[in-house]
């Protein structure tokens, strides 16, 4: 039996190895990005605090500071967590054999149904963040896409997977439906309207995952 092949975090290599098609429109992504909510008073105060810090210090944060000062608080405002049903995890390893390839990645952040002792069971959303430029060996989009392919293999439910990747303050969201991959425009977290929409998109994850779990 042949040993599984290795593949790096390279978008073109990944696309060719797994016959992925990049599409420019996908209903699942459009519906997700259209999310709209109202923030309560406490959420608004935290939102304003994050927005101010991004304006003042965001360009100088390292990856860990970005995670602590921004990403974790964004999920808190979004209210994504549901006790015993949905949790946000950080720095979790994922691996699987997919189509003869050994895939492995450490997910900077993922949203999943939880196991009893705070471990992810079924992952549905992945967020990769990086401070350097595209093309680096740690390209966050390639890492996110690798995590999505692993999740398809682990979940075995044929349902869409959701993701996001950051270059500094610029966010993009993505969906993988079967072998069709689509990503969004950039959302600049230093822009108030874009930051608010990032929060809404993260909040919408809760509904998407709860609906999905109800189907299982």
Regions found by a protein language model. Give the residues of each.
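Short terminal or interdomain "cap/linker" segment that borders an active site or interface and mediates
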Residues: 166-216
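Nucleic-acid nuclease catalytic cores
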Residues: 132-183
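Active-site metal-binding core of divalent-cation-utilizing nuclease and nuclease-like domains
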Residues: 86-118
């Amino acid at each position: 039996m042949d040993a599984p092949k290795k593949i790096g975090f390279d978008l073109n290599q990944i696309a060719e190895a797994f016959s992925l098609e990049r599409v420019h429109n996908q209903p699942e992504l459009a519906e997700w990005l259209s999310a709209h909510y109202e923030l309560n008073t406490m959420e608004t105060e935290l939102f304003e605090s994050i927005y101010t810090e991004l304006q003042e210090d965001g360009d100088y944060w390292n990856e860990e500071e970005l995670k602590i000062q921004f990403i974790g608080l964004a999920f808190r405002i979004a209210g994504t967590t549901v006790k015993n049903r949905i949790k946000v995890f950080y720095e979790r390893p994922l691996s699987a054999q997919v189509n003869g390839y050994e895939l492995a990645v450490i997910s900077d952040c993922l949203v999943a149904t939880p196991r009893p002792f705070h471990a992810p069971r079924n992952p549905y959303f992945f967020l990769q963040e990086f401070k350097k430029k595209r093309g680096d060996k740690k390209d966050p989009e390639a890492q996110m896409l690798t995590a999505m392919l692993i999740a398809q293999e682990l979940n075995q439910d044929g349902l869409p997977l959701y993701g996001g990747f950051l270059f500094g303050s610029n966010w993009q969201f993505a969906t993988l439906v079967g072998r069709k991959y689509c990503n969004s425009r950039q959302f600049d977290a230093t822009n108030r309207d874009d930051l608010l929409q990032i929060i809404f998109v993260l909040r919408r994850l809760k509904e998407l995952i709860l609906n999905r779990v109800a189907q299982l």
